[in-house]
Each structure stands twice: as structure tokens, then as C-alpha cells.
């Protein structure tokens, strides 16, 4: 059959061109040629669906969206690695290896990719399963999403049966493009490529994953079915099979060679097209690995050196103050621009007056800054030895920088606030919060549009959003008929939201999404919440005294009462419709979770809120009732106690994986 022969020829050509482009980084044909051949193959397979095979290049995307990921038990556990943090610990690790073996040995040094660990299983050369690491023993089947990664061969170059381990990641360029697209749509940005990769691979719709331009590297075998007698030999064999391996791997005979490799990539990491967060060190020979064995959690023959956060010195040139939606006044330092962890930094938050006092930060000081988690700029310390005598204390304003009202510091709080109900900065930030996806979810009404409407005096309160005039909007810059009609349609649709969205959107201090849901569920209507006594609110499981106090005080204000009445007259639903998933059916319902230590990618408070939205009960102390402890850096006594009680422990990577899995 002529068509069958042509289809097979096209598949072979396309697979070879993909290998040259995505694995070898040496394309031999232009993109247009590849696209033309792929189009021809698609047309032939459409005409002859009986000839479609799972490893065809056309089958990377297109399966129906899943309802959930099935669980997968790894043939061999995917253990985590121990850590070393400096030269002394590296030397001690090498010495310990050689003492155990009674001789010197050869090591392999590899880049530690900052992505999501995966397992890939091939049978007779064909990809049959791809899974996440999960807890190391049980992961999730994400084969459908991994198939969309063009660097991943759907069929090996030989009919081998093998399980390999690797890391799926998002290249820096793809990450920047993704965030630029999200910013243009006024969607929340991903904090870093690792989070973006994890979230992309946990999409139930593989077409979304395909649009994210992920890639991957294979870094080892699981159950070893190869003839290789060492890790470095195995990597050569995997490359021969067409799998994407990393060319920067290096064998090392001495600790000095290991240290030189680390020093080189510490300096050069920012020049790579993908993120790395350290170096993996392994004993090369498999018989040596077998002799060294494992601890309960990790192999003795391998460890990971994690890069320290890059720190740079710069000058505090000025400090400005911004006002948030709750009136909190936040100081922000502006620096002489410096490059930190690959990008230019020119400012960082100084949090509050206590932070400034504690670190004794002054205008014109030389300060050390870093990026927390290689993402968020942060001031580490002041270089006191560089002071010249020209430094000046940072003075908090006595009056609001937005409305000139007198600022206050409430008892027991570190923050200084503007309490004026007429403060324009609070009004704008409050409206931005009100229309956000987590609150009223009004599509097309992002921060820029809100500020534009405020500048035109079209809105001054939340209620004004529902009085916007179509003809007037059409006179504004970048407001065409289609965008205006879509905006007004979205605003009108938001009137039907369930009460918990409105309650969260009001921006009451300390009332997050979970508290808003609990209040709406308990009192059924906005009037019910507004008239509730402090004791009634406090009686709700999950609502503390500070939230109860904040809610009752909010509804005592005449301005709040007038707003509620206004919104009701404009037709906004103020009843609980039960539209959100019952927390009892949430993925982490019934789980008691404690967070301890320092998290690099997000604050513990943010992590706690996100876990609560997934149904977890987040508490502050470890007990027999605790199900999971999330342990960040420098976790102390809570970690020790959790280990003694046999409680499940997540590191930060596992936390991010779980959040990405359920948040999509």
C-alpha cells in the first residue's frame, strides 16, 4: 500500500528532524520543511485512521481532557538526594565514600535541573508511561502531557525495554514568553520556571501543556536493563537510543575536579537557557554504588550541592511608600540597578518600620541584596563598614502619601496604616481586588483598566462598576466596541456570583477566600453576616478572634452599610448559592498540616492559605493529630518531633508539586 509506505517514511523523517532539533540542537532542515511534512502526514492519517500508531508525531496532542490523574507505583522508588552546602561538606562526603570503599573511585558531576522529576517507561522501544515522582513510591500518570514535549521520543531508536528518570523543565525563553502572554491577559504570573513547569504538567487538558513549550533531560535509569556498568556509560547508551541527555556531565577523578566543576557552573549558570539550582554528584561505577547502598531516604552514593542565593552589594538611593487596599503603608527601597541571578534589580520591599529598625537600614547605605528563591529581591543586611557618615535615617511619613490623612499604628501591629475611607490608593487597590479572578472574576477588567476608569472619574466605589456607561467608555483610549461590550457583559454576569465571592471581594481585613466561604456558608446572606454578633462569627470553626473582630467592625461603618444597600439595589446577588466545592470534598479535606522552616518560593502564610483552600486544616503545632509537616530550610524542633511521631514530611518541592497538582 503506497499510503502506508509514505506514512512510515514521513514518521521516520519527522522523528529524525525532531531529534536533530530538540535533542542535538543541530537542525538540518528549516521549520517550514518540518511543518510541510507534518501537514502531509496529518492529512494521510486523517484519510487512513486505521494506520495511526501511538508513536506517530501527530499523536503528541489531541487526546480528550482527563477528569483526574491515575496513581502509578514506581518499579523502583525515586528517592530524594542528601545535600552538601560548601567545600568542607563536599570534601567530607568524598572522604566518607572512599573510607567506605577502602579506595578512591570515579565520580560524575551533573547539572541539577530546576524542574519536575519524572519517570519514563519504554517497552519494546515505545513510550508506554510517564509519571511524576510523587512521594517517591507512588506518582501520577502524566503520559498524555509528557507526549506533548517534542524533545521526548515517543519511540526509541532500538526496541529496548527500559525505565529512565529525568527532569521536565521550562526553558527560560518559554517562561518569559508565557509570563508576557499572561501579563497581556492580566493573569497572575508564574513565580519561576519550576512552578510553571509543574503547573503545566498537571493540566488535565494536554493541549494546554503543549502550548507551554516544555523540554526535558534524562539523567539516569530506574530499573537497570542496560548493559552499562557505570552511570556515565549508561548515559551514552541512553543518548544512542535517542533520549535527550545533558552534554555538560563530567567525570571527575578527584575532589579538586569536582570543586572546579562547581565553581565553573556557579559562574556560568546564568548563561544557560534553562534554570539549574545546583550540582548533582554521583559515584560512577554501578558496583561501587551497590556496595555503598542506601539510607532510608536517599542513596549514599549520590548527593546534591545546592547553589547559595546570589548576593550583590548596591546602594539605597531612595525610599518610597505605597498604600495597599487595607491601608497598609509599605516602604520600598530603590537601588542603583544591579544584576542578581540573571536579571536587573532596582528595588525591594522593606516591609515595615520594624524591619528597617532591626536591620538599621539608612538612605545611601550600601546593602547586600539577594533574590529569595532566585525570584523575589530582598535586603539581606547593611554593609556597615562602607558607611561614610552621609547616610540618613529613613523616616516614615506622618501622613498618607495618597490622601494626606494621618497615619496610625494599631496596637500589637508592625504595620502603619491609613484609615481614611476616602483614600484614593485604597479605593483603587480595593477595586482591583474586587474584580480579580479569586473574587468577582470580571474578565477584561484588569489593573490598567481600573486605573484608567478611576482617572476618568468613572468609578469611585465598587458600586460604580455596575453603573458604567457604554457611550462614555467608548470615548476612552483603547476602548473599542467589542472590548466595551465584552467588559459590560462580564460585569453584568458577575452579579450572579455566589455570596462567598462578593464577601471576599469586599476586601475586609483578614478575610481570605476560606473565611469568606465559611461566613457565607454559615449565614447564607450578606445581611446575615452584617447583622451577626461577634460571638456568632467566632463560633465558626476556622474563624479566629481577629477575623471576627474585623468583620463586625467593618459592618458597623455607615459607608459599608451604604455600599451593601447600593450593591443590592444594583442587582448583585447577596445569597450563598453553594457554587464552590464543599470543603469536605476538597483534595486535602481532613488533613492537618503544619508548616515550619523557611520556604524560598513563597511565604509560609501564603502556603497556608493555599493549603486551606484545598481543604487542609493548617495548624501551628505538631501533635499525633498532624498528618503532614511541610519542612523548609532550617526546620527545627517541629521536624524532629514529626519524625519521632512518624508523620509524613514534605519538602518545599513536594509542597509545590501538590499545590500545582490541585490548583492546575
Curated annotation (Swiss-Prot):
Its EC number is 6.5.1.2. Gene3D superfamilies: 5' to 3' exonuclease, C-terminal subdomain, 6.20.10.30, BRCT domain, DNA ligase/mRNA capping enzyme, Helix hairpin bin, Nucleic acid-binding proteins. Keywords: DNA damage, DNA repair, DNA replication, Ligase, Magnesium, Manganese, Metal-binding, NAD, Zinc. The keyword Zinc applies. GO terms for biological process: DNA repair; DNA replication. SUPFAM superfamilies: BRCT domain (SSF52113), DNA ligase/mRNA capping enzyme, catalytic domain (SSF56091), Nucleic acid-binding proteins (SSF50249), RuvA domain 2-like (SSF47781). One of its GO terms (cellular component) is cytosol. It catalyses: NAD(+) + (deoxyribonucleotide)n-3'-hydroxyl + 5'-phospho-(deoxyribonucleotide)m = (deoxyribonucleotide)n+m + AMP + beta-nicotinamide D-nucleotide. InterPro entries: BRCT_dom, BRCT_dom_sf, DisA/LigA_HHH, DNA_ligase, DNA_ligase_AS, DNAligase_adenylation, DNAligase_N, Hlx-hairpin-Hlx_DNA-bd_motif. GO terms for molecular function: DNA binding; DNA ligase (NAD+) activity; metal ion binding. Residues 583-664 form the BRCT domain. PANTHER family: CHROMOSOME TRANSMISSION FIDELITY FACTOR 18, DNA LIGASE. This is DNA ligase. The gene is ligA.
